[in-house]
């Protein structure tokens, strides 16, 4: 991570940290860096989610891109993976998405995709950061024919929808409940599943600029659970604000998280001989029950740090085609280059239709261990050094010895906040509480702050 770019682009409170001025510079400097690696005038797709600040930042970003001669195709409201797909399929130079994903409406973010559809690599981000930190803007200022052009490109959304439909199966007779989080999926999910022939019940489909992710979507699936129970839907599908995540709900209203979704898709691909190297890429946060289920099926795991960026890096480096996170980021590399909630939803319903099994039956093969996570506020300077504190190291070793292999402890720093995260999994809630609370008490006593 750099000074401006985190693991998922540049983020901050809109108009306070992520200002129009910064958005203009990101467009201008980002566009210039991209143009230095292109033989022709770059063509860049720009999309956004439904946040009230989206149009403000979009206008500033596009102005910056145009100022260095970039040709811009404005997609409007579209899922983040829709931008990634269109960049690659239409051979654009790059894509930019304006979104803060599952964060509340006051936040926003800007992330770049390279011409290959993957998030911009660290070297390109560092080139942009160097220009942001320069004392003077010395970039060329073309005039007249040297300026970029702007094209409204709403057909991009429809092309993305049609592509996702092409990867699925006819769903006639299946009742599907959707929660589009008042976000980017509100412009596409209904159409995708209508085209597949599903009977639909939809919530979280009325964005007003302020209600994105507000008590709806993958981080607040309670409303969808209730809708599924009341409507008798066969499955509920909850997306986050930019639709790069999916959390599902079975026909009984029970949650099916990213671990279970990855297992279902992974087992399906494995049985067809289509799971690359018979391996799923996951993170250190995946549940122990998920690991045990994969072991039972003979499916291998590759484990990375938390963050879909690291999952994708491992998949690309090692040639894997399925990976993801417990939070609902699922990357199916045969179809797209990044986590895609709507694509994952189409594949999940496809598996249900093809196997004739209910979602509860498919998900029941993974027994999730009770898990507890506690965040402890610490000084930023200490969060990466916690494991060097003797008392903390000692208590973790003591708790792991008590587990005797039937559980898991993970203590890690937050990548974005001054927090130390203490997580444990064990066969019972009582055991989990004991392990986490015991470790957390020691951490607070040693390095915690109010």
UniProtKB/Swiss-Prot annotation:
Binds 1 Mg(2+) ion per subunit. It is an enzyme of class 5 (isomerase). One of its GO terms (biological process) is peptidoglycan biosynthetic process. Keywords: Isomerase, Magnesium, Metal-binding, Phosphoprotein. It catalyses: alpha-D-glucosamine 1-phosphate = D-glucosamine 6-phosphate. InterPro entries: A-D-PHexomutase_a/b/a-I, A-D-PHexomutase_a/b/a-I/II/III, A-D-PHexomutase_a/b/a-II, A-D-PHexomutase_a/b/a-III, A-D-PHexomutase_C, A-D-PHexomutase_C_sf, A-D-PHexomutase_CS, Alpha-D-phosphohexomutase_SF. It comes from the Bacteria. The keyword Metal-binding applies. The active site is at 101 (phosphoserine intermediate). Activated by phosphorylation. GO terms for cellular component: cytosol. Gene3D superfamilies: Alpha-D-Glucose-1,6-Bisphosphate, subunit A, domain 3, Alpha-D-phosphohexomutase, C-terminal domain. Pfam families: PGM_PMM_I, PGM_PMM_II, PGM_PMM_III, PGM_PMM_IV. Its cofactor is Mg(2+). The modification Phosphoserine is found at residue 101. Its EC number is 5.4.2.10. The keyword Translocase does not apply. Mg(2+) binds at residues 101, 240, 242, 244. GO terms for molecular function: magnesium ion binding; phosphoglucosamine mutase activity; phosphomannomutase activity. HAMAP family: GlmM_B. Belongs to the phosphohexose mutase family. Catalyzes the conversion of glucosamine-6-phosphate to glucosamine-1-phosphate. This is Phosphoglucosamine mutase. It comes from Streptococcus gordonii (strain Challis / ATCC 35105 / BCRC 15272 / CH1 / DL1 / V288).
């Amino acid at each position: 991570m750099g000074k401006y770019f985190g693991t998922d682009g540049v983020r901050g409170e809109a108009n306070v940290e992520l200002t129009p001025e910064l958005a203009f510079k990101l467009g201008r400097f980002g566009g210039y860096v991209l143009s230095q690696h292109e033989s022709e005038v770059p063509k860049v797709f720009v999309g956004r989610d439904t946040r009230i600040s989206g149009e403000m930042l979009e206008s500033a970003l596009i102005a910056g891109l145009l100022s260095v001669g970039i040709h811009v195709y404005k997609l409007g409201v579209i899922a983040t993976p829709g931008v990634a797909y269109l960049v690659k399929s239409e051979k654009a130079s790059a894509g930019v998405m304006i979104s803060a994903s599952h964060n509340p409406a006051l936040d926003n973010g800007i992330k770049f995709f390279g011409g290959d559809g993957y998030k911009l690599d660290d070297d390109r981000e560092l080139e942009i950061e160097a220009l942001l930190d320069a004392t003077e803007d010395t970039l060329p200022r073309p005039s007249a024919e040297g300026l970029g052009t702007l094209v409204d490109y709403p057909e991009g959304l429809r092309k993305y929808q049609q592509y996702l439909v092409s990867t699925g199966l006819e769903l006639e007779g299946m009742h599907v409940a959707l929660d589009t989080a008042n976000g980017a999926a509100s412009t596409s999910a209904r159409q995708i599943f209508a085209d597949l022939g599903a009977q639909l019940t939809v919530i979280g489909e009325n964005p007003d600029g302020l209600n994105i992710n507000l008590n709806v979507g993958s981080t607040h699936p309670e409303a969808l659970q209730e809708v599924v129970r009341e409507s008798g839907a066969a499955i509920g599908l909850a997306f986050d604000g930019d639709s790069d995540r999916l959390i599902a709900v079975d026909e009984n209203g029970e949650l099916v998280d990213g671990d279970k979704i990855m297992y279902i898709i992974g087992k399906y691909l494995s049985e067809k001989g289509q799971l690359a190297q018979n391996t799923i890429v996951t993170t250190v946060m995946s549940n122990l029950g998920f690991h045990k289920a994969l072991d039972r099926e003979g499916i291998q795991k590759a484990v990375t740090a938390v963050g879909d960026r690291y999952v994708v890096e491992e998949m690309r480096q090692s040639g894997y085609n399925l990976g993801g996170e417990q939070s609902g980021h699922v990357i199916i590399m045969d179809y797209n280059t990044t986590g895609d909630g709507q694509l994952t939803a189409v594949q999940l319903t496809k598996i249900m239709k093809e196997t004739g099994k209910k979602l509860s039956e498919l998900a029941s093969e993974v027994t999730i261990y009770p898990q507890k996570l506690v965040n402890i506020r610490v000084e930023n300077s200490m969060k990466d050094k916690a494991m060097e504190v003797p008392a903390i190291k000692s208590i973790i070793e003591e708790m792991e010895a008590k587990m005797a292999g039937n559980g898991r402890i993970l203590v890690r720093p937050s990548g974005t906040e001054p927090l130390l995260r203490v997580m444990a999994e064990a066969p019972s809630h009582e055991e989990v509480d004991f392990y986490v609370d015991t470790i957390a008490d020691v951490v607070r006593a040693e390095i915690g702050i109010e």
